[in-house]
Amino acid sequence: ASDVYKRQAYARQLPRDDCRTLERFTRGFNYPEESDIKDAGDLPKLGVKTFFCSNVCAMYDRRTYEELGGFVESTLFNEDMIYAGHLVQAGYAIAYAADAKVVHSHNYGCLAQFHRNFDLGVSQAQHPEIFDAYPSEGEGIRMVKKSASYVCKIHKPWLLVTLFFQSGFKYVGYFLGKRYKSLPDGVIRWCTSNKTWWEYHLSLIHI
């Protein structure tokens, strides 16, 4: 893509010193060493990964940001990727700048992964104009396979058990989040990592 179409950029994330093995691999999976430019032409190959972007370290062209209406006014999670989806659909490109680096990683347990992926599923369900045609399940399966191959390669096969449980919690959270409209309010409050957001929005629903 020509420079004139690059209207959003995000940096490479490097793991912290205390980062666990699987999370360290995930950083490398999502933030490789090579820079890239992504636009609508990449959708057949990359699918939902075309819209991948992180506000942990990102920059935006202000005029395009205002043209597209900026971030959605109210979302539980994933505002950066939702904006990126609208950007790509508008004919612009996203730059992944691997030379720009920031140290950022998590050591989430299974339950934290569940809550986080529930919120991810909700955000995608609320924006079918972006995510219905490009579901995340395929990319998730690809990451699990790559992670399994990696832990075997480094001779730590016992981490396959951790990977199995983490992946299961992630998927169940995501699955429920995508179907949040069918869940009782109490279940939603338990599943989410942002109870305050739901207290406000559930009250609006019931007015």
Feature annotation, model-predicted:
Residues R12, G28-T50:
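Short, flexible, basic/aromatic active-site loop/helix in glycosyltransferases
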Residues A40-Y60, T75-L76:
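A recurrent flexible, glycine/aromatic-enriched loop bordering the glycosyltransferase active site
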Residues M59, R63-E67, K101:
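Short, well-ordered alpha-helical scaffold segment located
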Residues L76-Y83:
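Acidic donor-binding loop at a coil-to-helix junction in glycosyltransferase catalytic cores
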